[in-house]
């Protein structure tokens, strides 16, 4: 007998009578386990379901054994989220987020005790920061929740639960066991199409016809996260002395950043959640007295005097001036790609539909050097279409050294220098290049 065979742990395990690991769990048993762990609602989706195909690769990369995704819902308290005092709202966001993670972790522990492998993804942060500004999340909770029958996406790009409305946070658990019955999406959208989220959004990110300006949302609401934080750090680095720093950053902003670093990053708005009346448990006050609902919940957020963070020349920049002139604008930097792939993948995020008005053009982008790539960009009727490869006849061709192009986007290289040295070449007229540039933040 080898030393391994004589090891106390090995001999103890081999002497046990172990229960066989279940190959399939009854869905109702799994549901009961999740609800008893503290979830307010739960649904189950096999990983091979077509409606979560976009999530499959990411999940299997971190947990190759995954067979089923469990989507859990935890409610938030409504009145704190509605408060114009966003410290109160953020306290609710933070504690509710922690609750989701606690519930998901408890479910994983109980499954593990039954011999079932499981893994829970974070409700929000931490994420895979090394992938920034690309896809830094392991799984998108929202499409999983929709597939699991926990609601539908509202105009504001949040999942609306049929009962609890927008006042929920989501978690996802990966398990390596099959179930006997998966969940199905709800057959209607709880969104009541009131468009109060459109009216309340301070940067005009939510469009009444259904569009969404993700860059405007991220730039303001996530000011103290992600690239908003790096923008602040660069103000610190660029300041010559304390007086110069105070010229760049107000004392209130410095304290706000300290607060986020000390107690968890705070959202600047999330007004779209605050004003949403959808959901069976939420809807009555809106139906019973709409003017009172508007006066008590929507108007205080619209009338609040606050700093709004926008990229100069963006659609949000113009929107704040036009719709909320009593709010104070502050110009900040946009997302900065670090790779050509990242640039192409995030073009739809930074595209400015308002700035694209009147442009009807097809662009061929040819990148050479360290990161060669080709793409066809169509801007037409204030919409953007990105295709890999060179397709059709272009109105303008831009050929650029990849590192020079990225340096230009990151404001580390001059476009004039790049054109003079031939590192960026344009066929079709510089006016086309200028029109192209107007459509994207930076």
Residue ranges and their predicted role:
Residues 53, 96-280, 284-296:
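Catalytic cores of enzyme domains
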Residues 79, 181-184, 385-388:
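Short small-residue beta-strand/loop micro-motif enriched in glycine and branched aliphatics
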Residues 81-83, 182-186, 437:
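Short, charged, solvent-exposed linker or helix-capping segments at domain edges/interfaces
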């Amino acid at each position: 007998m080898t030393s391994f065979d004589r090891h106390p742990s090995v001999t103890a395990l081999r002497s046990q009578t172990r229960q066989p690991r279940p190959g399939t769990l009854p869905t109702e048993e799994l549901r009961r386990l999740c609800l008893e762990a503290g979830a307010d609602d739960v649904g189950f989706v096999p990983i091979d379901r077509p409606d979560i195909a976009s999530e499959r690769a990411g999940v299997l990369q971190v947990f190759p054994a995954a067979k089923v995704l469990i989507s859990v819902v935890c409610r938030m308290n409504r009145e704190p989220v509605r408060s114009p005092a966003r410290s109160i709202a953020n306290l609710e966001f933070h504690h509710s987020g922690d609750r989701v993670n606690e519930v998901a972790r408890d479910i994983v522990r109980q499954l593990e005790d039954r011999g079932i492998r499981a893994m829970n993804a974070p409700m929000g942060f931490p994420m895979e920061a090394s992938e920034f500004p690309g896809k830094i999340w392991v799984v998108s909770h929202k499409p999983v929740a929709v597939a699991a029958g926990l609601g539908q996406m509202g105009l504001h790009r949040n999942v609306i639960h049929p009962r609890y409305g927008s006042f929920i946070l989501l978690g996802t658990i990966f398990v390596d066991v099959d179930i006997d019955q998966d969940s199905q999406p709800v057959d209607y959208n709880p969104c009541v199409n009131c468009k109060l989220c459109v009216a309340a959004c301070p940067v005009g990110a939510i469009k009444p016809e259904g569009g969404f300006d993700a860059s405007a949302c991220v730039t303001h609401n996530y000011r103290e996260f992600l690239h908003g934080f790096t923008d602040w750090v660069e103000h610190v680095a660029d300041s010559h002395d304390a007086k110069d720093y105070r010229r760049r950053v107000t004392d209130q902003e410095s304290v706000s950043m300290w607060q986020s670093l000390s107690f968890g990053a705070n959202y600047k708005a999330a007004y779209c959640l605050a004003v949403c009346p959808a959901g069976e448990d939420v809807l009555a006050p809106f139906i019973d007295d709409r003017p009172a609902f508007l006066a008590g919940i929507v108007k205080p957020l619209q009338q609040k005097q606050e700093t709004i963070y926008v990229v100069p020349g963006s659609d949000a920049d113009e929107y704040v001036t036009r719709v909320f002139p009593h709010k104070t604008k502050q110009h900040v930097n946009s997302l900065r790609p670090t790779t050509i792939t990242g640039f192409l993948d995030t073009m739809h995020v930074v595209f400015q539909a308002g700035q694209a008005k009147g442009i009807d053009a097809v662009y061929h982008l040819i990148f050479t050097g360290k990161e060669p790539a080709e793409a066809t960009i169509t801007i037409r009727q204030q919409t953007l279409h990105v295709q890999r490869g060179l397709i059709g006849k272009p109105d303008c061709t831009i050929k650029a050294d990849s590192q020079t192009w990225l340096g230009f986007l990151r404001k580390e290289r001059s476009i004039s220098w790049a054109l003079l040295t031939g590192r960026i070449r344009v066929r079709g007229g510089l006016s086309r290049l200028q029109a192209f540039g107007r459509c994207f933040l930076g």
